[in-house]
Amino acid sequence: MRVNNGLPPQELEAYGISNVHDIVYNPSYDLLYQEELDPSLTGYERGVLTNLGAVAVDTGIFTGRSPKDKYIVRDDTTRDTFWWADKGKGKNDNKPLSPETWQHLKGLVTRQLSGKRLFVVDAFCGANPDTRLSVRFITEVAWQAHFVKNMFIRPSDEELAGFKPDFIVMNGAKCTNPQWKEQGLNSENFVAFNLTERMQLIGGTWYGGEMKKGMFSMMNYLLPLKGIASMHCSANVGEKGDVAVFFGLSGTGKTTLSTDPKRRLIGDDEHGWDDDGVFNFEGGCYAKTIKLSKEAEPEIYNAIRRDALLENVTVREDGTIDFDDGSKTENTRVSYPIYHIDNIVKPVSKAGHATKVIFLTADAFGVLPPVSRLTADQTQYHFLSGFTAKLAGTERGITEPTPTFSACFGAAFLSLHPTQYAEVLVKRMQAAGAQAYLVNTGWNGTGKRISIKDTRAIIDAILNGSLDNAETFTLPMFNLAIPTELPGVDTKILDPRNTYASPEQWQEKAETLAKLFIDNFDKYTDTPAGAALVAAGPKL
């Protein structure tokens, strides 16, 4: 028996994994590098070395999350608290699973992992020691261990010595469920959670993001019940300690816009907001790389080096990367430890209370302005609406931009009813005197996407206060307050009507989008608080 770094096999046997004879426990980056490039590896386990020093892997047919294969055990722990897909008006991915089917899936995964050489990574989710989850990840694939080492908070040697996992993630990517039809499931693949056992099981999908977003869903369950905001957002802090958070769905610009040489990064995707301020859940970043260039996004480009892990990019024979090639997926990605970005909050990824709250949307209709300043009611309305365009490739089967409404800019990861997140966020914003803004990083009447240069200038105007002092006019139908001019921004684009050949073209599209907003918000009108917010939305 050869056990690395002293994790006793009995610890894994307690989860149902048998015949444990080789554990690679909390492997170093150097060891993972050797393992991933082992010439004997085949299929999706195999890594390829790129000219930038980072290893690249393929995740197979799953190049994004598979929300239709997500299940939560419905039992006494979750029955009355979880936001269930089969109850109420709201649409979500929290499909109930019986304890019996859970046991069957657990058997599949533990049999898959039994008798194998296993990688075990112990890490934290959450930078606040009072509320963090201690998570143990178990996988037979080296690069999956590398992914979680990048993405979660790496414990010190001292913390590892006393590490007691609160949550177990068993990744059996190589196994599938042949009995899925009889069990009434979506497919042979599964991503299942049990809050009583505090465990996640993965089968059939190799996509690393299932482990990252799985733990985000769990934080989204545990923290708001304690009055702590749990947010699908990036965050950064200025020289004077001013904190900004950027909400948005995948591909709307959270990572790009929060990675700013003038400000220190707190994190790029998942945060909490408690009595002390804003804190990161993660220890790394997961950036989209499609059409990445050193000129447009130097910080992210320079983060792609040894210890970073690329997913689904095209690597040429000579090891160079074609970042423009989306033939495998538009959702090409790189994970890297957060310290690959030079300008970060140290030693712990947390800061004070946020004073600027930015909602990012990628409007495929070309109706919304590039920026508007929201009232308190509009803040709640647009947070609960969570409008964007679903961008290509972040979920399976989506290749063209399509409009979507995702509550709290992250409905796929919500474990409680959206109004619970809105209540906690509003409470935190009011206490901090925070102001919210809606920023469209999508399209306008030209048919082109608003440039990163213009969007960055808009973000600068929000953060330095010049937008708050700007003269504004009101966009009809949506009743949004828009600045008449901003430094460094082409004035013609501020009013979206000006980007069309005629204002009637905008009007026609605006009516279509306004109706979608109104129809979507109907699901919140069954409470007095929700009904009161209707006035903050568009009017036909």
Curated annotation (Swiss-Prot):
Its cofactor is Mn(2+). Mn(2+) binds at K213, H232, D269. ATP binds at residues 213, 232, 248-256, 297, 333, 449-450, 455. One of its GO terms (biological process) is gluconeogenesis. Its main location: cytoplasm. The keyword Thylakoid does not apply. GO terms for cellular component: cytosol. The modification N6-acetyllysine is found at K87, K523. One of its GO terms (molecular function) is phosphoenolpyruvate carboxykinase (ATP) activity. Pathway: Carbohydrate biosynthesis; gluconeogenesis. It is found in: Cytoplasm. HAMAP family: PEPCK_ATP. Involved in the gluconeogenesis. Catalyzes the conversion of oxaloacetate (OAA) to phosphoenolpyruvate (PEP) through direct phosphoryl transfer between the nucleoside triphosphate and OAA. This is Phosphoenolpyruvate carboxykinase (ATP). The lineage of its organism: Bacteria, Pseudomonadati, Pseudomonadota, Gammaproteobacteria, Enterobacterales. The gene is pckA.
